[in-house]
Design a protein with these regions (language model features):
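Short acidic, Gly/Ser-rich segments with clustered Asp/Glu that frequently serve as metal-coordination loops
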Residues: 10-15, 20-36
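Long, charged alpha-helical interface segments
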Residues: 91-98, 102, 106-112, 120-219
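Short glycine-rich or small-residue beta-strand-to-loop segments that form or flank ligand, phosphate
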Residues: 22-24, 80-85, 191-196
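Ordered, amphipathic secondary-structure segments that act as subunit-interaction surfaces
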Residues: 64-117
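A short alpha/beta connector and helix-capping loop motif
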Residues: 31-67, 73-85
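N- or domain-start disorder-to-order transition segments that initiate the globular core
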Residues: 1-5
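Short acidic low-complexity segments
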Residues: 7-16, 116-124
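Short, ordered loop/turn segments at secondary-structure junctions
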Residues: 50, 86, 116-118, 195-198
Length: 219
């Protein structure tokens, strides 16, 4: 198996094209929101891009929203959208993620909408038994780019963080993310992808998670 670390949505996309399980790291806040959702009992967590982004990778937020909506229907679950701006009004969040909400409306889904707040998001909504879609200009873009390119689609992409989430403290959140990746990767290998090479916290977190991954698989 191949274990690698990369940066940016383009790097995540390249890893997906190789068939590696891609682990997106966007500490502030997408992957931390995702970990909080997992710890809160979410059934599945996905990422999508907003309508406007400077990233050069192929995007299709409507497709990602449709995928999440179909899973919610299949599992008879509610859908939660965590959107940006993180502290903006729902009206602004719906405008920024217009393609996502249009696709959900087409599927007949009316989601619960919260901000992409990181660990604090669990104070606003109960994630247990829900499907979650996080719309984010960094982690969401990287997740979507990888999902569109991966042979297994969104099933080939996960998230991880080094920040505390739920009841996890210290290195527990990081270890939870790595264990989830190892359990799902099989023989495909894993790529840890810092969502933005311009965000030092993502780059350092990705390197930490990569070293944690190597430590875990070499036991």
């Amino acid at each position: 198996m191949i274990y690698t670390v990369t940066i940016d949505a383009s790097g995540a996309r390249e890893a997906a094209q190789r068939g590696q399980l891609v682990v997106v790291v966007d500490v502030i806040d997408m992957s931390t929101t995702a970990e909080a959702a997992y710890q809160g009992g979410a059934l599945a967590v996905y990422g999508a891009s907003p309508d406007e982004t400077a990233s050069p990778v192929p995007r299709d937020p409507g497709w990602m929203a449709g995928y999440a909506a179909k899973e919610a229907k299949e599992r008879s679950a509610e859908l939660i959208v965590a959107a940006e701006p993180r502290t903006g009004s729902e009206a602004v969040q719906r405008q920024v993620a217009g393609k996502v909400f249009a696709a959900l409306a087409k599927e007949g889904i009316e989601p619960t909408v919260v901000g992409n707040l990181g660990a604090e998001v669990t104070r606003l909504v109960d994630f247990k038994g829900k499907v979650v879609l996080i719309v984010s200009a960094t982690g969401g873009v990287a997740f979507e780019a990888a999902a569109l390119a991966h042979p297994q689609g969104p099933r080939g992409v996960l998230t991880a963080t080094i920040a505390r989430a739920g009841k996890l403290r210290g290195s527990q959140a990081a270890r939870a993310g790595i264990q989830r990746a190892i359990s799902q990767a099989g023989e495909r290998g894993i790529c840890i992808a810092a969502a933005s090479g311009q965000s030092l916290e993502d780059v350092l977190a990705a390197q930490y998670l990569y070293e944690l991954l190597l430590e875990r698989v070499r036991r």
